[in-house]
UniProtKB/Swiss-Prot annotation:
Native organism: Micromonospora viridifaciens
Reaction equation(s) it catalyzes: Hydrolysis of alpha-(2->3)-, alpha-(2->6)-, alpha-(2->8)- glycosidic linkages of terminal sialic acid residues in oligosaccharides, glycoproteins, glycolipids, colominic acid and synthetic substrates
InterPro entries: A-galactase_NEW3, FA58C, Galactose-bd-like_sf, Ig-like_fold, Ig_E-set, Sialidase, Sialidase_fam, Sialidase_sf
Name of the featured protein: Sialidase
Cellular component, GO annotation: cytoplasm; extracellular region; intracellular membrane-bounded organelle; membrane
Length: 647
């Protein structure tokens, strides 16, 4: 189940498995259409699962009350380097933070003493260094550690300028080592990577940069940055070097509402950008470059990668794989796979250059913020992450991840309580192995009836199946996220789909009336309450000093007359303010004459959807009148409104 409270959890989950239907398999496998060409299994099966972890830095020990922001890499000699912030005041830039480092010479089993790469200064004038990111030139052996240099301003407060002596500019620094990270030289590159004087702030995305292996830009070093442009928008930009780090330049800034972002080289030499979304969509943003990271195409939302607006990591599982090979398409991704909190630390695997992510496993179900991955010389992987108590290192292999390259889809579906629906299952076996007896396991409520079948999986081909779901008559209306796991002898793949029960289609709705909406200073459009995304919200007008206060109202046109029996309210997810308290609900057949209130009451501060129910009635319009706010504030904000009724 999802951790997003907007999607209801199915109570007391039961795992229901379905074996393939032999008759269906015999009838269809021979005619299965070819999938993406696969030359052998991209991920080798077998081996004993491995997952170990240990703390490298614990808050309050070894001189610093707080440690944050992990970076991880392997030196050309095979040593493992871990870098992170030591924060004497526990705050981000501007603060007297230091860039620290520990080294392992035995593949991460043991670690040397904590050392300083760039030392902050706690006495006036205060200076600090934060947010490390490693980048290794595999051709020369040079190691770079990019980080922030702050004096008086952090990312939000930095002003335009590039003078290294200006204390009100947040600067870009890079430390360089030619002896495997034992000693470092330092320089400020703010002017080098600021082609537009309107860029008033920048910082390197912590973790690890990349070096391209394929095509005309092979050897290029790329480190990702986030900048604030003249309009105040957060944009992503690749900073790169074609002369082994002697000089650095910035490519074209991309997107809006970006934040910490990473890149990975795809099997054909294109560069995939994967970004935190400061606009809070609840997912990762992605874009693709065809010119080695200088510029990027359109930015889109990857709805296979839920994210709570957090830093993440994306790498090639087999960094030395030949261009175009099956292994070159295998990517690993780590993040906090929740849309509402920094938790549920998860590693995912893609076998098709990030088009799908069928394999996932949780490594930290509790608190987990930033993380970074790197491939180790012995074929395992290093993971450095923030568990909430400092910096922790983990070592794992693909056998522990336990996946098979077989992405599958089950479409979202809507039905009424007491109804039954059958939906198709489509599986693409990207692996080079046959799976004669796959099974499908679904997380289902114990009172839901589910039946299904899946064909055998042939190498490089598509397979079909189906799932039939019967929802009891008394099921509470809502959107239910159902997890599905394809289980095979070679490993598992997973996906989710949404079963909508007893709710009208938001896509057919429109805003009939609203007392005010904030569009000048933020995206507080009223239409956000029917966009299906709880990360967006309607906000009443606030940018004018004389903006109206309570009561507030918003009315929906349902797109036709329906028999309805309730309204579901979801509060704004990322703020404790502007929460509706007392309310009234009205309905109308024509949008002019209103009946009611048909329901009234007081909402709580819960993040989950809250129901206001009333006797079933025919209506085309429904109105929420907000009478008060939970803490007495003047404004109102609503993430989503759903209408209970018959479609």
């Amino acid at each position: 189940m999802t951790a997003n409270p907007y999607l209801r959890r199915l109570p007391r989950r039961r795992a229901v498995s379905f074996l393939l239907a032999p008759a269906l398999a015999a009838a269809t496998v021979a005619g299965a259409s070819p999938a993406q060409a696969i030359a052998g299994a991209p991920v080798p099966p077998g081996g004993e699962p491995l997952y170990t972890e240990q703390d490298l830095a614990v808050n309050g020990r070894e001189g610093f009350p707080n440690y944050r922001i992990p970076a991880l890499t392997v030196t050309p000699d095979g040593d493992l380097l871990a870098s992170y912030d030591g924060r004497p005041t526990g705050i981000d830039a501007p603060g007297p933070n230091s860039i620290l480092q520990r080294r392992s010479t035995d593949g991460g089993r043991t670690w040397g003493e904590q050392q300083v790469v760039s030392a902050g200064q706690t006495t006036a004038p205060i200076k600090g260094f934060s947010d490390p990111s490693y980048l290794v030139d595999r051709e020369t052996g040079t190691i770079f550690n990019f980080h922030v240099y702050s004096q008086r301003q952090g990312f939000a407060g930095s002003r335009p300028g590039t003078d290294p002596a200006d204390p009100n500019v947040l600067h870009a620094n890079v430390a360089t080592s030619t002896d495997g990270g034992l000693t470092w030289s330092h320089r400020t590159i703010t002017a080098d990577i600021t082609p537009d004087p309107g860029w008033r702030s920048r910082f390197a995305a912590s973790g690890e940069g990349i070096q391209l292996r394929y095509g005309p830009h092979a050897g290029r070093l790329i480190q990702q940055y986030t900048i604030i442009n003249a309009a105040g928008a957060f944009q992503a930009v690749s900073v790169y070097s074609d002369d082994h780090g002697r000089t650095w330049r910035a490519g074209e800034a991309v997107g809006v509402g970006m934040d910490e972002n990473k890149t990975v080289e795809l099997s054909d030499g294109r560069v995939l950008l994967n970004s935190r979304d400061s606009a809070r969509s609840g997912y990762r943003k992605v874009a693709v470059s065809t010119d080695g990271g200088h510029s990027y195409g359109p930015v889109t939302i990857d709805r296979d990668l839920p994210d709570p607006t957090n830093n993440a990591s994306i790498i090639r599982a087999f960094p030395d794989a030949p261009a175009g090979s099956a292994r070159a398409k295998v990517l690993l991704f780590s993040n906090a796979a929740s849309q509402t909190s920094r938790s549920q630390g998860t590693i995912r695997m893609s076998c098709d250059d990030g088009q799908t992510w069928p394999v996932s496993k949780v490594f930290q179900p509790g608190s987990m913020s930033y993380s970074t991955l790197t491939a180790l010389p012995d074929g395992t992987y290093g993971l450095l992450y923030e568990p909430g108590t400092g910096i922790r290192y983990a070592n794992f292999n693909l056998a522990w991840l336990g996946g098979i390259c077989a992405p599958f889809t089950i479409p979202d579906v809507a039905l009424e309580p007491g109804q039954q629906v059958t939906v198709p299952v489509a599986v693409t076996n990207q692996s080079g192995i046959a799976v004669p007896k796959p099974s499908l396991q679904l997380d289902a409520s114990p009172d839901w009836q589910v039946q299904g079948s899946v064909e055998p999986l042939m190498p490089g081909r598509q397979a079909k199946g189906q799932v039939t779901i019967t929802v009891p008559a008394g099921t509470t209306p809502g959107r239910y996220r159902v997890g599905a796991t394809l289980r095979t002898s070679a490993g598992n793949a997973s996906t989710t789909f949404t079963v909508t029960v007893g709710l009208l289609d938001q896509a057919r709705m429109s805003i009939a009336d609203v007392d005010s909406e904030e569009t000048a200073r933020e995206d507080g459009r009223a239409s956000n309450v029917i966009d299906g995304n709880p990360s967006t919200f309607w906000h009443t007008e606030w940018s004018r000093a004389d903006a109206p206060g309570y009561p507030h109202r918003i009315s929906l046109d349902l797109g036709g007359t329906h028999t309805i029996s309730g309204l579901q309210y979801t509060r704004r997810q990322n703020s404790a303010n502007e929460q509706v308290a007392d309310y009234e609900i009205y309905t109308s057949l024509n949008g002019t004459t209103w009946d009611g209130p048909v329901a009234s009451g007081r909402f709580t501060t819960s993040l989950a959807p809250q129901r206001a129910v009333f006797p079933a009635r025919d209506a085309r319009y429904i109105r929420l009148v907000a009478l008060s706010e939970q803490t007495g504030h003047k404004y109102a904000a609503v993430a989503e409104l759903e209408v209970e009724g018959q479609r």
